[in-house]
Amino acid sequence: MAAGLPVTARGFFNLTVSGPGGSLQVDTVQPAMTEDRGRGPGAELFVDTFNGPIDPVSGHTCTSDADSCRGLAVWSITNPLATAPTLAFAYAGNTKAYTFAPPADQTTCTECIDSSDLRISATPVEKDGFLYAAWESGINNGTQVVPGVVWSQLRVDIRDHGGLFATQVRGDYYNFGGDDAVIYPALMPDSDGNLVMVFDHTSSTVNPEVRLTMRHGANFSSPGVLIKAGEAPYRPTLCGVNGFVCRWGDYSATSYDGFRTNTVYFAGQYANGGSFSRNWGTWLGRVHLDG
């Protein structure tokens, strides 16, 4: 392709996960970005949550703690440019449970900002045999159910003849107290094994803003640093009017600049000044990681 030669794209469709709880034709399957030195994992990796209407293992519909879903579906494609590439599947069932989150609050309205569904909205990342992904969930913070994040670090192994194994080795919830919402996460590991997460944050006292935190060790333990504060409420004449829930952005993003610099570029979403008719903005930045 880089040399201007023709390339034939080969692939698979109608991916379906079947289990004791039923069958689910999956949507929004995310390809993983490989950040390895050298040859990488030996396959192209893809991952997906169970975004309804059913968890094919439990039969649950992801609507409450008692009806929660769990696990990730992982696929690998080996020999992707061959006439007959090999597709393999693995189920990683040991993630945290997840449910559809309520809409988020902002300073002018309650449950009026879309907090996404259960899809992985940012590109997952593979590095050194680990696959990183994060998505939204409703999380009970002790006083109420709020939009929060489930993050997962999977160990993935490409077996002989194109087989695949995947299991979670680290993973947890990430959320705040009160009515604070943590939404649209994007992850990126660095060369020292730390994990960066950029995300959006909003509440009844905070206009939608961009924050960034880092995992040192087993879990994210801090609310991180404010990258870009929200400048105004988001579309206050529309959001929350007669119960209307405003769509919010759909993404955050990260990109690794290389092992020599150990720098992560990121993009997040914030509410910019009210002079914009649809005052939704994207903030770009970079962070240099010193371990």
Labelled PLM ranges:
Residues M1-G291:
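C-terminal PAP-associated
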